[in-house]
């Protein structure tokens, strides 16, 4: 193991290398290492034409020069294979603008690919992605036109009469990893990391590909200064270590200090978690929480689903269920926004690949995920809007393999203004963007799969609740205060089935104070 400085990155990483970058959105970004690559390119033009691969791309949901945004320089990246690009918006925009070929791959597949590469396997063979945009019969994971012009990344195969997808392995030349400590030998530990993601499999994948493993740490401990059980990456896998400056060794972009309640080293009272004001997000969170049952294992997606965690904390039912995040934590209360991926008071934190092993096998009782577009068939899009590419993240793995799926979001978008008063929903200004459309732009969730798998599917908004039936969406509830024709049916590009038993949403959802929710 050799200790390096940021300025050394340009000499270690070569033009055309495939570079795997760890991190989970706002958490665990190897910020100083990424900046070293960017700085070298700006100064010398090298390294260039890199193939970069990541799960949830490091970033803070802005155009700031952080995370993957630092790599959004023309000529630096030649290809990208990522699961989610929404956190690093500038980098995602370069893909939408067709600057270089890119593939948007399910997060569970990316993590399992690192494991397959480490084991010198042909790839990942799975049902995950069938009948979605990942399926080569649809778009084959292509995130832009340049990708469509190249050899397919994923292949449809049939084994014993079953259609499966083969996501093909590729060698990794460099792994870029953030950790907490290294010892003098190069053993690596992750005590301060809220997410133990893909780092271990990524390191072995690079090492077994004949590549290099570079780790950013807070501090180098003396020899034998780490407990063996705390070491997740052995020194034999590590080529270089960089000790980061304090301002680039963040837990995440919004939480610059170590948060022991996110690593299991401390518990805090859940009443310390801020209670949401009574708004449309809270309405959606409360209505979704009403579907929970005691003992459920539940995944919450990024964005509005974090309102469900708030609702559970406010109602005092957080300990009656197990909230799970695809990045690895289970138990406690998941954090939303930039810090998504970590949880407060988690019961366990496991590597992301192992979390997806459980998810793919059906361990989740329910998931609550975002709703950006839904169409008359019940398909959902959360991964592409115009030329803006976000990618699926863990959405496909989760929604395809969970017994009960709830999509949650406002009914329209784009300037929507609403008020909740006197137990009713008042629409002040309608959104300019319809979410319930004739055909979604990209299929991230396949209603065809759901019907074949007998999954229970709900679409929860602040003014209406739908369920998936064999031929499309059925409207089953509307909010008090809204007009069925003007506020719901006229705001859709198709006509749903309207249940003969259509009823009002529970009035408690629209009132101040606790609901008194019991599960």
What are these regions (language model features)?
Residues 2-11, 25-41, 56-72, 76-269, ...:
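Conserved phosphate- and dinucleotide-binding cores of soluble alpha/beta proteins
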Residues 5-18, 170, 283, 287-297:
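Glycine-rich phosphate/diphosphate-binding loops that line cofactor/substrate pockets in enzymes
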Residues 187, 267-280, 287-299, 304, ...:
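Glycine-rich phosphate/diphosphate-binding loops and the adjacent beta-loop-alpha structural elements
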Residues 50-52, 213, 298, 323, ...:
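Hydrophobic/aromatic residues located in beta-strands of well-ordered beta-sheets
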Residues 48, 274-277, 282, 286-293, ...:
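Glycine-rich phosphate/ribose-binding loops and adjacent secondary-structure elements
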Residues 18-23, 51-55:
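Short glycine-rich or small-residue beta-strand-to-loop segments that form or flank ligand, phosphate
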Residues 39-48, 74-77, 315-321:
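Conserved S-adenosyl-L-methionine
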Residues 17, 46-50, 78, 295-296:
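Nucleotide donor/acceptor-binding cores
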């Amino acid at each position: 193991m050799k200790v390096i400085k940021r300025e050394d990155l340009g000499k270690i990483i070569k033009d055309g290398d495939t570079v795997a970058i760890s991190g989970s959105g706002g958490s665990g970004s190897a910020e100083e290492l990424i900046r070293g690559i960017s700085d070298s390119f700006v100064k010398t033009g090298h390294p260039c034409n890199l193939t970069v691969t990541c799960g949830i791309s490091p970033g803070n949901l802005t155009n700031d020069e952080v995370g993957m945004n630092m790599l959004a320089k023309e000529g630096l990246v030649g290809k990208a294979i990522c699961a989610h690009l929404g956190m690093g918006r500038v980098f995602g925009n370069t893909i939408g603008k067709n600057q270089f070929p890119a593939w948007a791959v399910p997060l569970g597949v990316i993590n399992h690919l690192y494991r397959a590469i480490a084991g010198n396997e042909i790839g990942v063979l799975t049902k995950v992605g069938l009948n979605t945009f990942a399926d080569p019969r649809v778009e084959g994971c292509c995130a832009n036109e340049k990708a469509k012009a190249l050899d397919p990344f994923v292949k449809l195969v049939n084994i014993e009469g079953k259609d499966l997808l083969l996501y093909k392995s590729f060698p990794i030349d460099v792994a870029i990893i953030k950790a907490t400590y290294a010892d003098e030998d190069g053993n690596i530990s992750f005590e301060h990391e809220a997410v133990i993601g893909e780092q271990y499999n990524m390191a072995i994948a690079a090492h077994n590909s004949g590549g290099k493993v570079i780790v950013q740490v807070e501090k180098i401990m003396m020899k034998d200064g780490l407990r063996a059980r705390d070491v997740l990456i052995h020194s034999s896998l590590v080529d270089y270590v960089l000790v980061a400056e304090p301002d680039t060794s963040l837990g995440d972009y919004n939480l610059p200090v170590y948060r022991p309640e996110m690593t299991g080293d401390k518990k805090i009272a859940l009443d310390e978690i801020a209670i949401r004001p009574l708004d449309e997000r809270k309405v959606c969170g409360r209505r979704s929480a009403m579907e929970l049952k005691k003992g459920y294992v539940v995944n919450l997606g990024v964005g509005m689903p974090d309102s469900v965690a708030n609702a559970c904390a406010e109602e005092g039912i957080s300990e009656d269920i197990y909230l799970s995040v695809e990045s690895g934590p289970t138990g406690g209360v998941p954090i939303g926004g930039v810090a998504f991926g970590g949880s407060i008071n988690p019961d366990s934190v496991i590597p992301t690949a192992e979390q997806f092993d459980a998810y793919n096998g059906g361990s989740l009782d329910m998931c609550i995920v975002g709703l950006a577009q839904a169409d008359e068939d019940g398909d959902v899009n959360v991964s592409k809007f115009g030329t803006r590419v976000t990618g699926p993240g863990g959405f496909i793995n989760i929604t395809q393999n969970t017994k009960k799926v709830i999509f949650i979001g406002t009914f329209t978008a784009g300037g929507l203004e609403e008020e909740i008063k006197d137990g009713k929903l008042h629409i002040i200004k309608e959104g300019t963007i319809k979410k319930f459309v004739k055909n979604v732009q990209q299929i991230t969730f396949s209603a065809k799969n759901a019907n074949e798998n007998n999954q229970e599917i709900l679409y929860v908004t602040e003014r209406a609740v739908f369920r998936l039936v064999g031929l499309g969406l059925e409207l089953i509830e509307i909010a008090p205060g809204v007009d069925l024709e003007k506020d719901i049916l006229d705001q859709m590009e198709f006509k749903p089935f309207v249940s003969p038993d259509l009823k009002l949403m529970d009035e408690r959802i629209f009132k101040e104070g606790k609901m008194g929710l019991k599960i």
